[in-house]
UniProtKB/Swiss-Prot annotation:
Pfam families named in the record: Mg296
Gene3D superfamilies: mg296 homolog like, mpn423 like domain
Family annotation (InterPro entries): Mg296-like_C, MG296-like_sf, Mg296_protein
SUPFAM superfamilies: MG296-like
Name used for this protein in its record: Uncharacterized protein MG296 homolog
Domain of life (superkingdom): Bacteria
Upper classification of the organism: Bacteria, Bacillati, Mycoplasmatota, Mycoplasmoidales, Mycoplasmoidaceae
Amino acid sequence: MKPQLLALKQFVQTEFEKVDFETFRQNFNRCLEREQSTLLIYEDDDYDDQSFFLKPMLSDAFFISSEVVKQLDLLAVLVDNPKGDVKSCCQSFYEALTLFISALAITKGVDVGRYHQQLGKRFGVLTVY
């Protein structure tokens, strides 16, 4: 795995492990509710085909918190294209986690836009905020 992508994954995972999970879960589900009004969902879309990070976190807290760590690892492997450059891999990882990162910022009590911008500067990704 590319070092910069690994550093980004570890940063997000460490930030996730530092926050109170129940508060994070509530914030994530609220962010997801707001975002779902802008998502295009087609009749033939299968719920199982959606990314883990675009589904509400509703079940057992222990299961979900351990699943988040597994899904972060899986996502990093999926976007780690050997032919792609480091920047595009990190950008894909960031874009898949935009809602997740926003929920982290809210849970930490940090301005969402500023948090995204700092992440962009630190890891060289183009942020949406």
